[in-house]
């Protein structure tokens, strides 16, 4: 459950370490984003010589949340932290690798690239 001002870790090798949600996309009054939702983020911490710089604004897809996601069989998958993968304007991943597990809920037409790059799909 991600809202404005939430800080997230970055689960790819784009060069960003920490990002902050500045907008939840998808409707003017939408408050929260979950796994698989697209948010607008600002880079708060970046590594030197990375693809992205501190202060830049990107789209991102949420891949892990502490709140987790509920499956139809009643099980809940939760994670230790919130994480996102940075996207460009065409909603393609900026990084070439994805770190850590992602959930099966990302298996839509838009995010198959992230699923294929991830080391583990839960």
Curated annotation (Swiss-Prot):
One Pfam entry name: Ribosomal_L14
Keywords tagged on the record: Ribonucleoprotein, Ribosomal protein, RNA-binding, rRNA-binding
GO BP terms in the entry: translation
Ranges annotated as spanning the membrane: none
One annotated GO molecular function: large ribosomal subunit rRNA binding
One annotated Gene Ontology cellular component of this protein: cytosolic large ribosomal subunit
InterPro entries per UniProt: Ribosomal_uL14, Ribosomal_uL14_bac-type, Ribosomal_uL14_CS, Ribosomal_uL14_sf
Subunit structure: Part of the 50S ribosomal subunit. Forms a cluster with proteins L3 and L19. In the 70S ribosome, L14 and L19 interact and together make contacts with the 16S rRNA in bridges B5 and B8.
Functional note: Binds to 23S rRNA. Forms part of two intersubunit bridges in the 70S ribosome.
Similarity comment: Belongs to the universal ribosomal protein uL14 family.
Name of the protein: Large ribosomal subunit protein uL14
Organism expressing this protein natively: Alkalilimnicola ehrlichii (strain ATCC BAA-1101 / DSM 17681 / MLHE-1)
